[in-house]
Amino acid sequence: METFPRTIFDDVHQQFRSTFRSWLDNEVVPHHEEWEKAGITPRELWLNAGKQGFLGLNVPEAYGGGDTDDYHFAAIMAEEIGATGVIGSANGITLHNDIVLPYFLGLANEEQRARFLPGMVTGEVIGALGITEPNTGSDVAGIRTTGLKKGGAFIVNGAKTFISNGINSDVVIVVCRTDPEKGHRGISLLLVERGMKGFERGRNLDKLGMHAQDTAELFFSDVEVPAENLLGEEGNGF
């Protein structure tokens, strides 16, 4: 019996907690040490999480998601990941759900939603957010990566570092300067996809902890990103 019982979780939340904890105990905990040594989790884990409904709980049902904006579920996932000691192995899932997906839900147009969200719910498409840079850290106003317009595309050049999900990711929201003359008002968000020419991944960085969370360097050399991969309005990335 809890000394100070919490009242913020109802029966549905607690049922979800039990289901998620069981999944962690059976599918993640037994492999955690192996993945920590490997420095990455297998893509099969993502597909498994998607199959169980643990990805995209906040995504509309039309795209296969859980269609709920109830933050309690995210809180429960964070609590249970911490309680089982598998933060390195499961942190990428919370990043995908709670940091990357809200960008799509808040800024993506209908074509982008239809193209990316179903796969992000099933685990076939893993997301990452590219802000931090080697020389500027996470100072968004000071980023140096550029995405200059050329015809019907943006040409991206620059580098990012310490990017969580950097190795596994299939789509990266890259914060870059599309108009260097406008300061922070010239910053935009571009969706850079796996396989685009000139997009390379560097080292999977060796960290002090959370080793199974792949954290990488990303390099962009004249990457041609089509205009339809602009997320939100041009110049509103800051």
Predicted feature descriptions by range:
Residues R194-L205, D214-F238:
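A glycine-rich, basic-preceded beta-loop-alpha segment at the flavin cofactor/substrate interface
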Residues A153, N157-R201:
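A short core secondary-structure module
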Residues M1-V12:
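Intrinsic disorder at enzyme termini
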Residues G123-I131:
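A short, Trp-centered hydrophobic/proline-enriched beta-strand micro-motif
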Residues K51-G123, N165-V171:
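Internal helix-loop-helix
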Residues T136-D139, F154:
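Hydrophobic, small-residue-rich alpha-helical packing segments that form membrane-like cores
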Residues N97, G137, T161-G166, M210:
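Glycine-rich phosphate/pyrophosphate-binding beta-alpha loops
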Residues T145-L148:
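A structural signal for short hydrophobic beta-strand segments in well-ordered beta-sheet cores
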